C-alpha cells in the first residue's frame, strides 16, 4: 500500500510490516515452482496495484503428442532437425536445431523454442533429416542395392542415425525406402498438450509492458516500484536470452531505485 504521508510503501505480511521508499519486484514467474517462484504475487499485484496482466503460460517447454512412439529411446538426440507446427494445415512456426526424445515427450532446443507457438490440436511435423524427400529415398535405394544388410543398418550407415532409432523407425513404417524417406522428412504427430510450469524453462505473460517505463523499469502509475525479470511480459528463445534479460532489467531497476534514495 502507498502511505502518502511518509512517502513510503508498506508491505504487510502475516508476521510484520515493511516500509520502504523504493521496492524492486523480482519474484519471477511460475516456472520451476520448487524454487518458490510459483506466481502467487501476480494476483496480489493485480488486486492491490490494479496492474494489467498478460495471461501466464509455460514457455520453452516440451511438447506431448498422441501415441508418442519413442519412450524406449529416451535420451537419444539429434543435432540438426527441422520442426514445424501446423494449424488447419497452415504453417504457424518453424525452428531448426536440436531434438531430444524423453520418456514422455519431445524436447530439445528446437522443440522448446517452437513450443511458444504450439497449441493442443496442432500438428507437429519433424524432419529428422533436412533434405528433399526424393533425394533421401534415392540415397536409401542406392545403398540398399549395394548392401546385404537390413534396412535399419542401411539407414544408420547412410545417414549416421542412431541405430536404435533406425530399428524402431523401420518397424513403424512399411518396409520400403519411400516410406522411410517420408518418415524421415516429415513425420507428423497430433499435439495433445504442452508440459506445464514444472518443466517449462520460463514463463510467458506477466505485467504488461504498457505499465512499465522500460528506461528505468519503474511502474508508470506507482512511483518507487520497479520490476524486473520473468515478472514482465517478455520471454525469449533458448540460449541465455531470458537470463540476460533478468540480469539487465534487474541492474536497470537497481540503478533507478538508488537514484530515488
Ranges and model annotations:
Residues 50-175:
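An anion/pyrophosphate-binding glycine-rich loop and adjacent beta-alpha core
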Residues 1-18, 23, 87-89:
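Conserved beta-strand-loop-beta-strand element in the redox core of flavoprotein oxidoreductases
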Residues 22-68:
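Glycine-rich loop(s) and the adjacent beta-strand/alpha-helix scaffold that form part
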